């Protein structure tokens, strides 16, 4: 199954100093691990705010959420999940009925 998450950094609740190089670096490293494991399939940086959109692939929603919740910024409370939705194949590419 695939899932789409959109997150934003909680810059309204935390000062810039809260986003330490260690946390931000750890975030990038963890996303690379999840990508190498085939769980994070695609990652985009948001152009309108700090945060990301991530396409996840997992056997269940619980597995995808666990991967998302393993991110250092999420664990530190610095990341808000704005959208988390399950996806299904687009029917328009299938046979016409």
State what each model feature region is.
Residues 1-97:
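Conserved, structured core segments of small domains
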